[in-house]
């Protein structure tokens, strides 16, 4: 199926948390592949955000009272609806975000897997647990979890379903409400996921989508929420962290990256070259965890460069709403300008183009070829700065030591990839990298898809984690309840205070030696 109809967009628009839609100024949403208008979206205001929070707080109080099992069942129904509507969701992702269909399918798979994981584990994670008390048998200590309240989510355009719905699901299961600002370029992807959540039984006031500019809607969300989740640039993340810090609320963010791949002797270069095309050019390189630097041992660098260049040149660009295309479009003129600027700057300063290197307006207005450079030096803009597009540079290195040193020579630390002669060798190299996730024998998907493990960045690549238990519990306040069941620390009846105080330390030391105490 091609571009969604105007009736579909009209239906989704009715779900936006804006009361007087027809009276608002609007922003045009284009089909990325062609540049032709698809529809419009009303521009939200700070007042819309405040109204959404007022309704969300009322809805959240009732939602939090429902058993975790009931909340999880809503998410299971949502999961099933995603599967039923997968073709429509992929169509919308392609139209609004310009993805190749296989890249759109990655998002749909993530929606299903994420919802399934948190629906399955949430009851166990949120169940109050007994922990070691001060005095065994005499005291009892339990840890419980209360929802934060209303969570704010500010999501980006590059993965507009994964990074809206999949960040919201654990917050909702934990008993929170969510007020979300989608990126202004991809609001209907967020609304489509919201529609499925509502159909699954989620109260509408509990999950509010407020489209609008970040400077207005995003700021208002940051100023009203009880916890803030953000995905975007490191610069914007820093400003939001400062704002959250002034309010003393929790903050989590996945930010930029300049992700490295290491290739050592003994690998199957044909296999690595093929895998590297996906690692570098998924979603036209507009992926926070995609690879932009490849460090290859000198002995195999020429052969790898040739094989990788051949693989990249064979990639098919296109606008088809099917699986015949390898790479889709950039999303905006701004992204196209950044990629073109980085390539032009590098080649003007001596970099060599192995593959790609130019825009492709014959395919679509925002297409750029997947590009591979060599001879890149630090005075070139693309050497240290994130491109966030279909551009990767190859660097020959003397050995693994140099590869690790250069891979770690960055402010970022989001994702990395290692291809070594053996899996144990690859895992040893991985453990030395300053990166929140490292994939061995894979570019990014295994770490991202390991939903029971935390995902996030080191350095300026992020704060906090999504996925795993951390991705759910961050949306809660832990509460310790300690009960003195026999006596407390006051002297027992008939025991002089002086004698009691002298006895306390020996008692504690004895308790420390009991089995199971550490």
From Swiss-Prot:
Pfam family membership, one: Aldedh
EC numbers for this chain: 1.2.1.79
Binding site for NADP(+): 157-158, 181-184, 232-233, 255, 386
Keyword entries, A-Z: NADP, Oxidoreductase
InterPro entries in the record: Ald_DH/histidinol_DH, Ald_DH_C, Ald_DH_CS_GLU, Ald_DH_N, Aldehyde_DH_dom
UniProt GO MF annotations: succinate-semialdehyde dehydrogenase (NADP+) activity
Membrane-spanning segments: none
Catalytic reaction(s) noted: succinate semialdehyde + NADP(+) + H2O = succinate + NADPH + 2 H(+)
Coiled coil: none
Active-site feature positions: 254, 288
Stated family: Belongs to the aldehyde dehydrogenase family.
Function, in words: Catalyzes the NADP(+)-dependent oxidation of succinate semialdehyde to succinate. Although it has succinate semialdehyde dehydrogenase activity, is likely to act physiologically on a different aldehyde(s).
NCBIfam families, per the entry: PRK09407.1
Name this polypeptide is given: Putative succinate-semialdehyde dehydrogenase [NADP(+)] 2
Organism expressing this protein natively: Mycobacterium ulcerans (strain Agy99)
């Amino acid at each position: 199926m091609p571009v969604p109809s105007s009736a579909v967009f009209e239906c989704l628009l009715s779900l936006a948390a804006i009361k007087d839609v027809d009276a608002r100024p609007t922003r045009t949403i284009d089909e990325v592949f062609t540049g032709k208008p698809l529809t419009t979206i009303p521009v939200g205001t700070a007042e819309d955000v405040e109204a959404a929070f007022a309704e969300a707080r009322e809805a959240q109080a009732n939602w939090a009272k429902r058993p975790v099992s009931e909340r999880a069942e809503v998410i299971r129904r949502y999961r099933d609806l995603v599967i039923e509507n997968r073709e429509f969701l992929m169509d919308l992702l392609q139209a609004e975000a310009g993805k190749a269909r296989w890249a759109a399918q990655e998002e749909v798979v993530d929606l299903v897997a994420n919802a399934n994981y948190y629906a399955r584990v949430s009851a166990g994670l949120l169940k109050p647990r007994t922990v070691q008390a001060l005095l065994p048998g005499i005291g009892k200590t339990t840890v419980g979890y209360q929802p934060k309240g209303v969570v704010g989510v500010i999501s980006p355009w590059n993965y507009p379903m994964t990074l809206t719905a999949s960040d919201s699901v654990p917050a909702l299961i934990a008993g929170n409400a969510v007020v979300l600002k989608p990126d202004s370029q991809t609001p209907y992807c967020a609304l489509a996921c919201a529609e499925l959540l509502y159909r699954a039984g989620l109260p509408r006031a509990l999950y509010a989508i407020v489209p609008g500019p970040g400077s207005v809607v995003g700021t208002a969300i940051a100023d009203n929420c009880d916890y803030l989740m953000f995905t975007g640039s490191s610069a914007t993340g820093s400003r939001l962290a400062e704002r959250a810090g002034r309010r003393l609320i929790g903050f989590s963010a996945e930010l930029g990256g300049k992700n490295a791949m290491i290739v050592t002797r003994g690998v199957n270069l044909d296999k690595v070259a093929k895998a590297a095309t996906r690692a570098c050019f998924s979603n036209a390189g507009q992926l926070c965890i995609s690879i932009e630097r490849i460090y290859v041992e000198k002995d195999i660098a020429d052969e790898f460069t040739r094989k990788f260049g051949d693989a990249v040149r064979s990639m098919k660009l296109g606008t088809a709403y099917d699986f015949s295309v390898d790479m889709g479009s950039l999303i905006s003129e701004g992204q196209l300008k950044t990629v073109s600027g980085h390539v032009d700057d590098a080649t003007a300063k001596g970099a060599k183009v192995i593959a790609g290197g130019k825009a492709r307006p014959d395919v679509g207005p925002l297409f750029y070829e997947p590009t591979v450079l060599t001879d890149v030096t630090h005075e070139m803009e693309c050497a240290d700065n994130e491109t966030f597009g279909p551009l990767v540079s190859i660097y020959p290195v003397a050995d693994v030591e140099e590869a690790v040193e250069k891979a770690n020579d960055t402010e970022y630390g989001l994702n990395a990839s290692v291809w070594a002669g053996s899996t144990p060798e690859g895992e040893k190299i991985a453990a030395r990298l300053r990166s929140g996730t490292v994939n061995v024998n894979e570019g990014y998907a295994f770490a991202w898809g390991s939903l029971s493990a935390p995902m996030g960045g080191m350095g300026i690549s992020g704060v906090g984690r999504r996925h795993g238990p951390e991705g759910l519990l961050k949306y809660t306040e832990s509460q310790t309840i300690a009960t003195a069941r026999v006596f407390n620390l006051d002297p027992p009846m008939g025991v002089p205070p002086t004698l009691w105080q002298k006895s306390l330390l020996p008692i504690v030391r004895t308790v420390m030696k009991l089995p199971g105490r550490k």
